[in-house]
Amino acid sequence: MKTILKLLLLVAVVTTTTSTAFAASKSTNRDWVDASTLTVINKAIDDGKPLNRLDISQFNIPKHARLYLTQSTGIAILFRTNSRSIGAVWTTTVKGQGVNYTPLFRNGLDLYIREKGEWVFAGVGKPSTKNTEHRSALVKNMEEGMKECMLYLPMHNVVTSLNITVDKGAIVEPMPSPFKHKVMFVGSSITHGFSAARPGASYVARFGRELNVETPNIGLSGKCKLDDFFADIVCAAKADAFVFDAFSNSTDEHIKERLRNFVKRITTAHPNTPMIFLQTIKRDNANFDSVARKRNDAQRTVAEKMMTEICSQYKNVYFINPGIYAGDDHEGTIDGVHLNDLGVQRTLDNIVPKIKKILKKYKIK
């Protein structure tokens, strides 16, 4: 508890001091806009915390998951501007890097601009590798005219402030969301986004652009084990469909003990909403490790058996098998478990047609 209070105090101090510093150092040839005043999408719940996945005070979240749920994972900002260049200044709470993801994934920004109805990659906000204060150009030298922009936030850090910078005198305004539906994803580190190259390259973000839907991301690295607090979040959330990567962190015993109650709770809260469960990945780190192979085989076997039974009992529950799919050539992950960009593409090629077919039944298209 003391550690959490210290962390929250640090966040408050960082937010106050850096906002003052940035305001005092604004360049005379740039205008700045607080991103939280623009259109925020991919939130599971509209809770007044625009740059955090959730307001954790609303739930009984265990200590090990609280920080993860205050991260900006999956959140994006929609805005319109006629600026010929776009940049950003933002602050995060944690320095340092991990071993199985890029600095862009953890701390960077990812900008897309809509062109002829499609979201097209435009540039990235390159984060500092030494500090929690970041400044970066995103795109320069654009043609004149209004652009419709979508800016993805860092995937594995808490963002305490974000300002978008544009040419002096340029228009920046909230963009009405073009997304009519919301498909919420819940799961493990794979759903969290590990190990896509950048925030907009995760399978959840790409799914959203491909199907033209909002995609709140409640993927928590190493922590999705069919726990009650995940069910609490799902029950409180408002979405047109839910997709679950629920077996990647769960042992076979977790699945046996918790799956039925988990399904009962979420279907009671959302009786007419499609609940789509994905089979977990066939892990390449188990190719020669017999212990890892036994664990992965047990996960997959129990998940398949129980989901077959559950799907026969609940008309709005579905099981996609294979689900998360890295391919059969052993080249689809960064470390034998987490999808690289090739694995992301293969997973999307596998699940998108199947999920589209399910969603069509509910007039979600």
Where are these regions (language model features)?
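A short helix->loop->beta-strand "cap" motif at the edges of active sites that frequently abuts
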Residues: 270-275
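Histidine-centered active-site loop/cap adjacent to the catalytic His
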Residues: 334-365
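Short helix-loop-beta junction
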Residues: 204-217, 308
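Glycine- and acidic-residue-enriched helix-capping/strand-helix junction motifs
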Residues: 98-100, 193-201, 294-297
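Catalytic nucleophile-elbow at a beta strand-turn-alpha helix junction centered on a G-D-S/GDSL motif
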Residues: 180-204
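Oxyanion-hole/transition-state-stabilizing segment in secreted/luminal serine hydrolases
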Residues: 207, 224-260, 265, 280-286
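N-terminal secretory targeting modules
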Residues: 3-10, 20-182, 358-365
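Substrate-gating cap/lid alpha-helix
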Residues: 283-321
